[in-house]
From Swiss-Prot:
InterPro entries: Aldolase_TIM, DapA-like. Keywords: Cytoplasm, Lyase, Schiff base. CDD domains: DHDPS-like. Its main location: cytoplasm. This is Uncharacterized DapA-like lyase Pisl_0309. The keyword Magnesium does not apply. GO terms for molecular function: 2-dehydro-3-deoxy-phosphogluconate aldolase activity; 4-hydroxy-tetrahydrodipicolinate synthase activity. The lineage of its organism: Archaea, Thermoproteota, Thermoprotei, Thermoproteales, Thermoproteaceae.
Amino acid sequence: MRIEGVIVATVTPFTKDGVNYESLRTLLSKIVSEGYQGVFPTSSTGEVTKLTFEERVKVMEVAKEVAGGRALVVAGTGTGDHLSTIEIARRYKDVGVDALLITPPYYIQYDWAAIYAFYKRVLDKVDMPTILYTIPLATGYNIPVEVFELVANEYSQVVGVKDSSGDFRYHLDLIHLLGKRLSVLQGLDLLFVPSLLMGAQGGVLAGPNFLGRITLEQYRLVKEGKIAEAVALHNKLMPLWRFMGGCGLVGKLGGKWPTLYKVATQIVRGIDMGPPREPLPPIDDKDRRELEKLLKDLGLI
């Protein structure tokens, strides 16, 4: 499997009692119909660590049903140890997802050997197309490129690496050392065009939840060599990304970023997203007004 293009890390709609599967189905249907290459519901943006295992499986069942072979369905583990990762991965495999994205162990800052051992334990037990992942603002550490290289050399089911580090020099190392064998996928919307220009194969991004086909247009422009147009579109979006941030990397609101993506999706698409799941905070009226202005400036509302 060679993953190229845009995989959408979707938000998870909630009611006061649980996941709003009707709204989820509507959102996924719109994203797939817009032509995106894949969907990734159990993501950081989708509040995966706040979903029960049963909710995660049900979310992926809905995604698989909606995609219907028209888009890749990627499932994220969202777990911090190898036993839980193996358990949820096997359940995802039973659902029939197309690929697995493995969340690295978090809470403790692990060394190279521990990270490598974690991947070995999981991949020895789970044989399905797999995307490795680094997200240091959630784990407290960045995974050395050499660890990804070792794991990819040993396990043929590894097909890609998602990079949400925000460290562009590190990202260039991934492209240089792994890009010929694996799909290097940018995890931050604000770095998507620069990544494509330097040779990344695509992105796993949350912006398309509310941007419509804009992210696909960025991808198309780069692939067609229309670099000036791609850069102009990138720069047009920068005020939005500076406000919203991504993984807490930039943005005025820091840890509220998953809520912002959810609110933006409801404003633009008119789908009931409900509240974030605690302890994620809601945004206040001032933040909402600023978000609405930015969306209006882009012609989205």
